[in-house]
Amino acid sequence: MDSFLKKVYIFSLIFILPVLINADNEVCFELEDNPYPNHPAFGVFSKYVNVLDCIEIYAESNISDEKILHIAAVAAELLDNDEDGNVDDPLIESSLIELNTVMPVFQSENGNAIETFFDNLDEDGCTGAVVFRNEIDPDQPGHWGDDATVEEVLHTINSCGHVEVYPALYALEPNASYLTDAMDVARGGQFITFPGTYPEDSWYHYDDWTCDYECMAMEYLYWCIVTNMDILSDAQTCAGIANEWEPCSPELFEATDTLMFNLVTDPANQLPQLAPDGNYCPSSADVKKKISPISFTVFPNYPNPFNPTTTLQYDLPEDG
């Protein structure tokens, strides 16, 4: 190859490579303006995405479009894990729609927007979690310590979907479900609050004093689902989470926590098996544009590795 052709070839690689990389991040959702700019709570947001009619994402103006669409893609992948354009579990879909499920995206936990939002959120609905700008990394979907999107979206779907639809499996109270019975085994006993130290044979030992029993159960469900997806098995992550969660690979999960492995992998339960990669654009997808009536209830905001001590508690009247 002569020098001219070499230069052309190298130039072509340099030019084409970014296009190929960008082409890998495909999200077939439309970013819109906030449909309720004058609402006392939702007026703090300027950006909006409707995800399969199930989750409505509201974001502050300084959150990049890329990050908002990343949340939308991850949410869609968790709801439609086979990416055929349809939510995998119709009952979960119905619950999320009926409860007007919302995911707020804030610049920071210290800003005025989050206080204004919750102070004025005065009607029924479902907010299972929030996410902050610095917790979102579209380049590392679900990677512990870098991208909390998978965790916070799972908390939202589980809180507003699974706990509501399948209480025998997922109710969060002590002695109430398969989930909490399994958690009592994983923690080495039934501890309503953090016991200070856990039995030596436990493998789930969450140590956040602000997290009550129900919060512990929600975190446990998250760990089980993402472990089965093989999101946590790299050496750095395993070491980083060992103080809280020991079986960091699917193989260890199967061998250690047989109760939850059986629940998570049972096809009848229709839990997501594949880790989101931040791409969602099924050829058969019908991306809907329904805007639900504003009506919300705040569910517990479960901690994440970025803000492990964040606690949001609001007393909201049932009717504004």
Language-model region placement:
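Post-HExxH zinc-binding segment in Zn-dependent metallohydrolases
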Residues: 161-237, 244
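Acidic/His-rich structured neighborhood in mature extracellular/periplasmic domains
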Residues: 42, 52-195
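A general structural signal for short secondary-structure junctions and capping/turn motifs
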Residues: 2-4, 48, 92-97, 211-215
